[in-house]
Amino acid sequence: MSPAFDIAPLDATFGAVVTGVKLADLDDAGWLDLQAAWLEYALLVFPDQHLTREQQIAFARRFGPLEFEMAAISNVRPDGSLRVESDNDDMMKILKGNMGWHADSTYMPVQAKGAVFSAEVVPSVGGQTGFADMRAAYDALDEDLKARVETLQARHSLHYSQSKLGHQTKAADGEYSGYGLHDGPVPLRPLVKIHPETGRKSLLIGRHAHAIPGLEPAESERLLQQLIDFACQPPRIYHHDWAPGDAVLWDNRCLLHQATPWDMTQKRIMWHSRIAGDPASETALAH
């Protein structure tokens, strides 16, 4: 039986736009069809949803427990005033850091499963969210490089990735603390991940990854940058141009994502609900 909604694949190795469905009214049969599509496409885009906070949280919960229910990713302060780049406060540091390709919570003991992200207010230009298919990236590696990365691991740290931008994080950093700053031992993760539900292999890289055991620091950095540069190229990438009311659901176990710049004199208000990873498959090798 075909699903009760329409699926239009993106012009990329992954992703689809889903129409003919209201996520707030999704029944159990529809959710099962949607989950199957998510595992196939890894990224689902839902235009014109206009979810309330409660509806977004409820939809995200259908995929499992949440790492956190809702976080505002925005250059607008709670009092309505605009953050400016020169403020360089915790949230501005997060916004700038998120412009590097990354997967969520790889620097935590348990990596996130996925996320629901929605747009409330968007700028007139810029502010897209990019996604990159690490399944297709792994498949496209030459056999020698594929064999090499199969044997390697890397450390993942938000302290490391933010320090590369000149941001010195602290355990007590206000908005970092809610974002999942991990102050324990640095997690170690394989460069090649096997998806726990589909069995497909993908690269596990991104801006938090560093310090491959057995390699000199410079060689480790070169290899990780080489992999990102190769992986995050067409047809393995898609950048979503947001409209108010859009929602997306992505699989954090096989995609990277990034924010893109915009004129920060314009408001951008986004809402992020993060789906917790299953400890059986998403726990770091060491942490």
UniProtKB/Swiss-Prot annotation:
Region forming the signal peptide: none
Summary of temperature dependence: Optimum temperature is between 35 and 40 degrees Celsius.
Keyword Cell cycle: no
Example of a GO biological process term: catabolic process
InterPro entries: TauD-like_sf, TauD/TfdA-like, TfdA_dioxygenase
Family: Belongs to the TfdA dioxygenase family.
UniProt protein name: (S)-phenoxypropionate/alpha-ketoglutarate-dioxygenase
